[in-house]
Amino acid sequence: MADRNVRPTGTQTAMADRNVRHADVDWRCGGRGIFYRRVMSGHRRKDSSRRYHDRVARQYDAIYDDPYWEFHDELTWRMVRPHLPRDASAACADLGCGTGKWGLKLLKSGFATTFVDHAAAMIEQVRGKLESNPRARKATLVVGDIVHLPELADERFALVLAMGDPLSICSDAQAAANEMFRFTKADGVVIATADNKLAALDHYVGRGNLEALEEFVRTGRTRWLTADESERFELTTFTPASLAKLFERSGFEVLSVVGKPVIPVRGNKMLLESAEATERLVKLESELARDPAAAGRAAHLQITARKPFVT
């Protein structure tokens, strides 16, 4: 989520609601039974995204502590759960892990889990949560760029999650998808999210800047804005079709692309006042997801793709 001081200007827009980031950084290691690795991206460039996410790491969980995100997370986990590996010894990865929300769920489910984030402060938050975790020895923490993760072995993971739109934040989404294909096992599954290009159109229309609208439609690129200009970074948005093509070019079989969420409940959180109401809304989301056209109205897209067996 963006700073409260965010102000969209010119051809830029403030995109929101994410759990993720990318890049190469130094880190401090510690904690017992937890392996740490530092992965260099090979690119020495100004990394605004890293600076932003390092700064907000300590308050990150609090930013997303409200009924909307409880609904969002319940919806997400129900989409992930059918793809959990049947083999208890399988390895999983959480790319752009942030403070570890999804990786910790995988770890709790019994899977050896690799947590990857470009922001060292985020990885430190994960480390703190793991210190009292009885499954900590099954966790590997990596500070690195999802575009280039040479220390992740080929054909390693049965399930790879990339939640919070790391594909939109990273410098090269195709390279990131190629990396995912490399380290996903045959018949393994990747579930990833990205910013929806169609949802961002309203911002440009609201600004009344036709030239900016034309540029955005042409490129699909916008920016994450904060009060501190040194923390502003570029975002790549996708349509359902372009996100599917991204994964198909890497060699994946696309199983689904859905919007998340389709129902704009964030505009009226009173709809989420009870667990019973949340359950009803989750069921409605599942029903709407059956229609591919529904994805167009969601702020974010979620793709599920499988790496096929090579015959």
Each language-model region and where it sits:
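A short SAM/SAH-binding and catalytic strip from SAM-dependent methyltransferases
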Residues: 158-172
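Acceptor-substrate binding/catalytic loop of class I
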Residues: 227-242
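A short acidic, Gly/Pro-enriched loop at the edge of an enzyme's catalytic core
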Residues: 151-159
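A C-terminal cap/extension of S-adenosyl-L-methionine-dependent methyltransferases
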Residues: 245, 255-311
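Class I SAM-dependent methyltransferase SAM/SAH-binding core
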Residues: 93, 99-148
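Conserved class I S-adenosyl-L-methionine
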Residues: 40-87, 101, 105, 189-220
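A short glycine-rich, Lys/Arg-flanked "PGG" loop and its adjoining helix->strand segment in the class I
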Residues: 174-189
